[in-house]
């Protein structure tokens, strides 16, 4: 069996791993593809230290993002209820529905902080009343907000 070469990836490669990972590959793959195209570099003590420092910085940045999400979750629970005004027909049914975009606008208006509508899950809302929407603020942090739909 052929000897394998250990390399540090400089960019993410679907079949191998993500940037900064240490991988073992066939010598020909390393020599003919990864090294010439700058997708990996040989492992040296200096490279290992560099990868370690980069991972520490990424961990600090990820912790900061999580803390910001937790703070925003607290702010949302402090506000408590968001009101959305919609037009209503004679029988009390809304013209259209309340979408995650409507909820995002209401939250942005109240908190002055932009939120991606794709992270908001809203039940089917066709009537006036109170409803609960779920928001994914971070992979580990979710929030629930109360929505009051009025005419």
Swiss-Prot record:
Pfam families: Ribosomal_L9_C, Ribosomal_L9_N. GO terms for biological process: translation. This is Large ribosomal subunit protein bL9. It comes from the Bacteria. Belongs to the bacterial ribosomal protein bL9 family. Keywords: Ribonucleoprotein, Ribosomal protein, RNA-binding, rRNA-binding. InterPro entries: Ribosomal_bL9, Ribosomal_bL9/RNase_H1_N, Ribosomal_bL9_bac/chp, Ribosomal_bL9_C, Ribosomal_bL9_C_sf, Ribosomal_bL9_N, Ribosomal_bL9_N_sf. GO terms for cellular component: ribonucleoprotein complex; ribosome. Binds to the 23S rRNA. One of its GO terms (molecular function) is structural constituent of ribosome.
């Amino acid at each position: 069996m052929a000897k394998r070469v250990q390399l540090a990836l400089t960019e993410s490669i679907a079949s191998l791993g993500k940037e900064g990972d240490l991988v073992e590959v066939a010598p020909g793959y390393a020599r003919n593809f990864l090294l010439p195209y700058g997708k990996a570099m040989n492992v040296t003590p200096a490279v290992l230290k560099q990868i370690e420092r980069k991972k520490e910085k990424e961990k600090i940045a990820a912790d900061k993002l999580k803390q910001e999400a937790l703070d925003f979750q607290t702010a949302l629970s402090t506000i408590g209820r968001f009101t959305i005004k919609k037009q209503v027909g004679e029988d009390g049914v809304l013209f259209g529905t309340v979408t995650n975009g409507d909820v995002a606008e209401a939250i942005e208006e109240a908190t002055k902080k932009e939120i991606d509508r794709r992270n908001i899950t809203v039940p089917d809302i066709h009537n006036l009343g109170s409803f609960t929407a779920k928001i994914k603020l971070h992979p580990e942090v979710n929030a629930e907000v109360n929505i009051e739909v009025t005419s």
